[in-house]
Amino acid sequence: MTIKSDKWIRRMAQEHGMIEPFVERQVRGADDSRVISYGVSSYGYDVRCAAEFKVFTNIHSAVVDPKNFDEKSFVDINSDVCIIPPNSFALARTVEYFRIPRDVLTICLGKSTYARCGIIVNVTPLEPEWEGHVTLEFSNTTNLPAKIYANEGVAQMLFLQSDEACEVSYKDRGGKYQGQRGVTLPKA
């Protein structure tokens, strides 16, 4: 597998709709203010977080069960910022919609700006022929409230292309998160 460059990412986004909307350069500032960078980079694409959050709360004293997840465990927030309580987490989604080619696996890594503040971003790999908005999980590992900024960079996608296409893709398997839009909760 080889990691793909900015030229390949740009071509796949513009000619094949791999990333929509696509920002073809690295954005570091907007309207004379600093932002956490997003857009294409040398060997990846920095995604933005949409202004749609689900913040975990345990007001119902529920047990977290991935096979039977209780939607009431989250508070919905639509805002340019999201405050995550200490030692808690929030779900969000990317601004960008992805269409992954059949011979590509995409790995997501959190941005160091957030990691250096104790905020960890987790996303499982985007499998061949998966498409949708990426659901992002932010863990606040600190004992203080933590802030996430919508419409700014939160994670980097790395695109790894295989020397041959897989026999069975995520789409072929009828993956349960195929075509997801918005923040998607666990499905068992």
Curated annotation (Swiss-Prot):
This is dCTP deaminase. The keyword Oxidoreductase does not apply. Keywords: Hydrolase, Nucleotide metabolism, Nucleotide-binding. The active site is at E137. Homotrimer. The keyword Endoplasmic reticulum does not apply. GO terms for biological process: dUMP biosynthetic process; dUTP biosynthetic process; nucleobase-containing small molecule interconversion. The gene is dcd. DCTP binds at K111, S112, T113, Y114, A115, R116, T135, L136, E137, Q156, Y170, Q180. It catalyses: dCTP + H2O + H(+) = dUTP + NH4(+).
